[in-house]
Amino acid sequence: HIDPACLDTLNSDLPWSGDDNMPAVLLENNVEYPVKFRYRGIYSASHYLGGKKSFRLSLKKEGPFKPYRKLNFINPKSFNMVNNHMGMWIAGRMGVATPWNEMVFVRINDEDHGVMELYEQPGGDFERNRKLTKEEVPVYRGEYPPITGRELTEKRTLWRKASNWEYVSDADS
């Protein structure tokens, strides 16, 4: 559940207004958990246009989906809705470490939003959560440059500058 006034604020000037974290409550197995709610996808209109918007929930450390702290609920771009999900499943079966991914039915404020794709947000604990190594692995998280005006960059520039990357693990690099 999220306060309708908070949703109005997030929806007020999309995509610019959707990035603020708002307090919300996640109901899982009849237990309420405090979370932060925000929209996703400023660079991809399919995430924020229409009634079914992609969003992220940030949970406390002891949340219902631990060890995962950030969960992305994606409105899949493909019409059959399973292309990415099946790709992740196949990669996992082949031994590739993949983010946790499920197809889930979503309700927000007692309103059905249908099936969405749930992804964990990988971070510095990705390898540790999967027990892939005995030692810490250097992990960097890439973020697109901040939007400073109301213009989006013409092309995605994530790989063009080292300043777009943040060190997010405890390992020596």
What are these regions (language model features)?
Residues 1-173:
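Phosphate/dinucleotide-binding and metal-coordinating scaffold of catalytic cores
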